[in-house]
From Swiss-Prot:
This is 5'-nucleotidase SurE. The lineage of its organism: Bacteria, Pseudomonadati, Campylobacterota, Epsilonproteobacteria, Campylobacterales. SUPFAM superfamilies: SurE-like. Pfam families: SurE. Its main location: cytoplasm.
Length: 267
């Protein structure tokens, strides 16, 4: 039977990861290793300066752990290299995140980081996120569509193989709409996010300053000279966006111009 490792950044008890397990439990043998507490926006943080404690969850056949103060990257690393080191995972899936992971969100996202860690460890990986609100602001949150999408994706992967080669992963965002309003899926590039940048300064009882960072999404910016619609465009029209992400951050288009610039600097 196929084996899938689940993680998230909303925490072990989050509704999204429970919905994810429920969607897949008849398709594969499910293992869950997730942070004990919420770790949203922790990015690719991995713990190397403090110990990690893994708590085995009773009644889950030894397949569920929550990691005290662990990040999604910690969870996936620990699961593959120690907790279930004798298990050959077919997929790592991170989610279902409560909120979008599009554009620059992917850099901050702990959800995407969990899938990235799976990719680093050599396992095909998917990050999946549920949009909390869009133009249908009165639509109650439901994971029905996200569950259907992940079931379809996983079945396709099990039947036809993982679609990406090398150190790449799938990033999936699901619109906040009903199954009846859903328009289909689009393969999209990552768009550009515009944020409202806020810093909230406060004073504690000892008259010392502390800060809350606010990084609230405002809108997105259209991609220039791009025929293909972005992940934001897909979500805005009630489509699921599926975006391939590459771990190689090298800007190959700039290598030659950078060489010329560097040669000029040496003259």
């Amino acid at each position: 039977m196929k084996k899938i490792l689940l993680t998230n950044d909303d925490g072990y008890h989050a509704k999204g990861i429970k919905a994810l397990e429920q969607a897949l439990e008849e398709m594969a043998e499910i293992y869950v290793v997730a942070p004990k507490h919420e770790k949203s926006a922790c990015s690719q943080c991995i713990t190397i300066t403090a110990p990690l404690r893994a708590e085995k969850i009773k009644g889950k056949e030894g397949r569920h752990y929550r990691i005290d103060d662990g990040t999604p990257s910690d969870c996936v690393y620990l699961a593959i290299n120690e907790l279930f080191k004798h298990v050959c995972f077919d997929l790592v899936i991170s989610g279902i995140n409560l909120g979008s992971n599009m554009g620059e969100d992917t850099i901050y996202s702990g959800t995407v980081a969990g899938a990235i860690e799976g990719t680093i460890q050599g396992v095909p990986s998917i990050a999946i996120s549920q949009i909390l609100s869009n133009k249908n602001k009165n639509t109650p949150l439901s994971f029905d569509l996200a569950q259907k999408i992940i079931q379809d994706l996983v079945q396709n992967i099990f039947t036809n193989g993982y679609p990406l080669k090398g150190r790449k992963l799938l990033n999936v965002n699901v619109p906040n709409c009903s199954l009846q309003e859903y328009k289909g899926e689009r393969i999209t590039p990552k768009g550009y996010r515009l944020y409202k940048k806020e810093v909230h300064k406060r004073t504690d009882p000892k008259n010392e300053s502390y800060f809350w960072l606010g990084l609230h999404p405002l809108e997105w910016q259209k991609r220039e000279n791009e025929d293909r619609l972005s992940d934001f465009d897909a979500i805005a029209s009630n489509h699921v966006s599926i975006t391939p992400l590459n771990l190689d951050l090298t800007s190959y288009d700039d290598l030659k111009s950078l060489e010329s610039w560097h040669e000029g600097m040496l003259k």
